Amino acid sequence: MIDDPLVKSLLTNVVEDESNLPIVQALIDGVETDEAIAEKTEIKLNIVRKILYKLYDMGLATYKRSKDPETQWFTYSWKFEEQEVINHIKSDSEEYLKMLNKELEKEEDTMYFVCPQGHIRLDFETATEYDFICPECGEELEFFDNTNLIKQIKDDIKTVESNYKSFTKKVDA
């Protein structure tokens, strides 16, 4: 599961650094206690705990607390919540696609003007309010051909849809 690009991206964002992914892999492999995970991954115990709590805060891991009858210390048994990872990815992908489609619609429906010095990009209505003069430097605004930007957004949409489709095929299999 961790090899999927969407899963890896989500988990890397949560654990802050790709070098902490072995902690997640240990959880997936069924290692339960923070001490055992630290031992298996050779990552400091305080870092393991920090990452486990981050996963917990995102709902990607849960724990059960039990008391050792001999030492009277609490032991935390952790479990990776695969379904929550799936839910996060579905939700994040849908949200990102909505944002991209909204951005695409805006770019396709709007005429833009830019400052030749790179100070500002304004839609037609706002540019008319400034008489097509840059409010920062006084240069005359130029028409901005956003064809390449529209193409890039469409490519991004295709990529997200393709990655999401590939992910759901793996999950549903």
Curated annotation (Swiss-Prot):
Keywords: DNA-binding, Transcription, Transcription regulation. PROSITE patterns: HTH_TFE_IIE. Pfam families: TFIIE_alpha. GO terms for molecular function: DNA binding. It comes from Methanobrevibacter smithii (strain ATCC 35061 / DSM 861 / OCM 144 / PS). The gene is tfe. This is Transcription factor E. Monomer. Interaction with RNA polymerase subunits RpoF and RpoE is necessary for Tfe stimulatory transcription activity. Able to interact with Tbp and RNA polymerase in the absence of DNA promoter. Interacts both with the preinitiation and elongation complexes. Transmembrane segments: none annotated. InterPro entries: TF_E_archaea, TFE, TFIIE/TFIIEa_HTH, TFIIE_asu, TFIIEa/SarR/Rpc3_HTH_dom, WH-like_DNA-bd_sf, WH_DNA-bd_sf.
